Amino acid sequence: MATSNNPRKFSEKIALHNQKQAEETAAFEEVMKDLSLTRAARLQLQKSQYLQLGPSRGQYYGGSLPNVNQIGSSSVDLAFQTPFQSSGLDTSRTTRHHGLVDRVYRERGRLGSPHRRPLSVDKHGRQADSCPYGTVYLSPPADTSWRRTNSDSALHQSTMTPSQAESFTGGSQDAHQKRVLLLTVPGMEDTGAETDKTLSKQSWDSKKAGSRPKSCEVPGINIFPSADQENTTALIPATHNTGGSLPDLTNIHFPSPLPTPLDPEEPPFPALTSSSSTGSLAHLGVGGAGQGMNTPSSSPQHRPAVVSPLSLSTEARRQQAQQVSPTLSPLSPITQAVAMDALSLEQQLPYAFFTQTGSQQPPPQPQPPPPPPPVSQQQPPPPQVSVGLPQGGPLLPSASLTRGPQLPPLSVTVPSTLPQSPTENPGQSPMGIDATSAPALQYRTSAGSPATQSPTSPVSNQGFSPGSSPQHTSTLGSVFGDAYYEQQMTARQANALSRQLEQFNMMENAISSSSLYNPGSTLNYSQAAMMGLSGSHGGLQDPQQLGYTGHGGIPNIILTVTGESPPSLSKELSSTLAGVSDVSFDSDHQFPLDELKIDPLTLDGLHMLNDPDMVLADPATEDTFRMDRL
């Protein structure tokens, strides 16, 4: 059956093809018949017109323009030499009677001879529209194309006046020409762009040449205007003659390019966010989370209007008083830890915490913007990191999320932004906050950011190298405006802290060649355990040190690491921090390092954190960290 069906199918196809060809040829012959009928009438009219207008045109054109009589004779000869073009003249002459014929001819003429066509159709066919007075006025604009080729002054005149004349056109030929241009310009006039340019002085009418400078200045803005006749026929050939090198970008609204590319693999759910890029903050519900770093020229003064703390509601803010001030800066991490209470922190969070980039040279702190409306999770993300600051200190947007009455857990994500500066790695991990469904406070600090290293000591944590630890000690007491911090933080504790941090750095550098747990991430565990688990005062003592307040209501803080680490690290970290989970301190002793007696994380502990296969021995351990029992 297949062999018998194939010949039938082919024969049917051939029959259909022949039928279509026959129909097309019949239509074409009919059109040509009409053209041949109108051609004779046109020739008679043309001869009479040239006899009438010949003497006056010599005075009309003058100077360097060609002889009028030669123009008339050449135009008449042109009708005999190029029958298709002359038939084009013919149909344009008799458009009122043969509108359909004219339309069909123009489509065939454009498709068949796109370069010769404008010579006649545009010379005469366009004039049929532009001069509504009568056929007597058709021929002088026919020679404006000649004027254009021979005289520059005539070029300017012809570009100005015929466009005005064509603004009066009410005929149907302009609509036909526009329709044909929209159909055929992409194919035909692209291929012959150069020849069209050479022929444009002779072939294109004055309107096209008049609009050519406009289209060259602003390429392709009006490629397909709806009802504007002048721009449509004029700008389409001009934009295609550009060769596509200057595309029309006016209608394409590109978003501003992100300096740090978004991670295509990050899941939208915040608890599982692999925060290896700042784009994950968009999923974490941080309205203030930005899309990357500022340009080097951007200063903190430029950003306070954009950066606003993410706040759930004023009731939640006042009831919950849990502030997160993730201020991350390479050189002086502790300088940003200004301890305030909830409402004052809320208003100063956009910048009071985040404008100090380096301990040597902190930039001026701009006035923070007023806090956003109660639910401001839809606000546009602010820029995360300012690269152009001299000390390489990225400015972080404030992420102040105050706990609601149901104590929704906070998930602080620190997606590592890619470093933008060639000399340093300033791409500090911005911290986004999200209220997830888990009741426990899960502070996600990214573990994949090599950008957390200071330019001065690339392998040590910011501000904790031996050279910069004195700065860390001095700025720690100076920035903490709270009297408790100034009284309790002694030089001995600060030095011990810096030594412990250096010890962490040495341990970390031994195993973090893959930058899975860079020095910044280990300090997230250690300092949060040593310094930050104070239950009464908010404020981040360190960008790596995740010190959060519970105001007596949040004794349990779980540090989890997303980044490149598996999600099971939250359980492992909870097991490692189980010893300090229930510690909650009053404002009487703010830095209870001696009371905590926390040993620094050993290599075994860090390997345990690195182990993705490790699970909690007791699954009930997770329940001890939950907040619903409060």
Curated annotation (Swiss-Prot):
Changing S151A: Up-regulates CREB transcription factor activity. Reduces interaction with 14-3-3 proteins. The record marks K571 as: Required for ubiquitination and degradation. Phosphorylation/dephosphorylation states of Ser-151 are required for regulating transduction of CREB activity. TORCs are inactive when phosphorylated, and active when dephosphorylated at this site. This primary site of phosphorylation is mediated by SIKs (SIK1 and SIK2), is regulated by cAMP and calcium levels and is dependent on the phosphorylation of SIKs by LKB1. Belongs to the TORC family. Residues 140-174, 189-221, 257-328, 355-475 are annotated as: Disordered. Induction: Expressed in a circadian manner in the suprachiasmatic nucleus (SCN) of the brain. Expression is highest during the day and reaches a nadir during the early subjective night. A motif (Nuclear export signal) lies at residues 242-258. Residues 194-208 have a biased composition (Basic and acidic residues). It comes from Mus musculus. Its main location: cytoplasm. This is CREB-regulated transcription coactivator 1. PANTHER family: CREB-REGULATED TRANSCRIPTION COACTIVATOR, CREB-REGULATED TRANSCRIPTION COACTIVATOR 1. GO terms for cellular component: cytoplasm; cytosol; nuclear body; nucleus; plasma membrane. Transcriptional coactivator for CREB1 which activates transcription through both consensus and variant cAMP response element (CRE) sites. Acts as a coactivator, in the SIK/TORC signaling pathway, being active when dephosphorylated. Acts independently of CREB1 'Ser-133' phosphorylation. Enhances the interaction of CREB1 with TAF4. Regulates the expression of specific CREB-activated genes such as the steroidogenic gene, StAR. Potent coactivator of PGC1alpha and inducer of mitochondrial biogenesis in muscle cells. The lineage of its organism: Eukaryota, Metazoa, Chordata, Craniata, Vertebrata. The modification Phosphothreonine is found at T149, T161. GO terms for biological process: energy homeostasis; entrainment of circadian clock by photoperiod; memory; negative regulation of membrane hyperpolarization; positive regulation of CREB transcription factor activity; positive regulation of transcription by RNA polymerase II; protein homotetramerization; rhythmic process. Binds, as a tetramer, through its N-terminal region, with the bZIP domain of CREB1. 'Arg-314' in the bZIP domain of CREB1 is essential for this interaction. Interaction, via its C-terminal, with TAF4, enhances recruitment of TAF4 to CREB1. Interacts with 14-3-3 proteins, including YWHAE/14-3-3 epsilon. Interacts with calmodulin-dependent catalytic subunit PPP3CA/calcineurin A. Residues 271-284, 385-394 have a biased composition (Low complexity). Residues 257-270, 361-384 have a biased composition (Pro residues). Keywords: Activator, Biological rhythms, Cytoplasm, Nucleus, Phosphoprotein, Transcription, Transcription regulation. It is found in: Cytoplasm; Nucleus. The modification Phosphoserine is found at S64, S113, S151.
